[in-house]
Amino acid sequence: MKTSILFVIFSLALVFALSPATEIEETDRACGQFWWKCGEGKPPCCANFACKIGLYLCIWSP
């Protein structure tokens, strides 16, 4: 029972975390911020962010 509840909570958190990223991706911004997709054909990450190889997401990098 506890596992099911945790799975549902984690799934909802993931949906809410990724939905703004999808929305922003469709707006053709000049650079990608946290959790934006990066790589070939995508805009580069903004300042203070780096494209994480393998995940192809912009991750904060000081």
UniProtKB/Swiss-Prot annotation:
Q: Which UniProt keywords apply?
A: Disulfide bond, Ion channel impairing toxin, Knottin, Neurotoxin, Postsynaptic neurotoxin, Potassium channel impairing toxin, Presynaptic neurotoxin, Secreted, Signal, Toxin, Voltage-gated potassium channel impairing toxin, Voltage-gated sodium channel impairing toxin
Q: What is known of its domains?
A: The presence of a 'disulfide through disulfide knot' structurally defines this protein as a knottin.
Please give the positions of the paired cysteines in each disulfide bond. Answer: 31-46, 38-51, 45-58
Q: Which Pfam families match?
A: Toxin_12
Q: Which residues form the propeptide?
A: 22-29
What protein name is recorded for this chain?
Answer: Delta-theraphotoxin-Cg1a 3
Q: Where is the signal peptide?
A: 1-21
| One Gene Ontology term of the molecular function aspect | sodium channel regulator activity
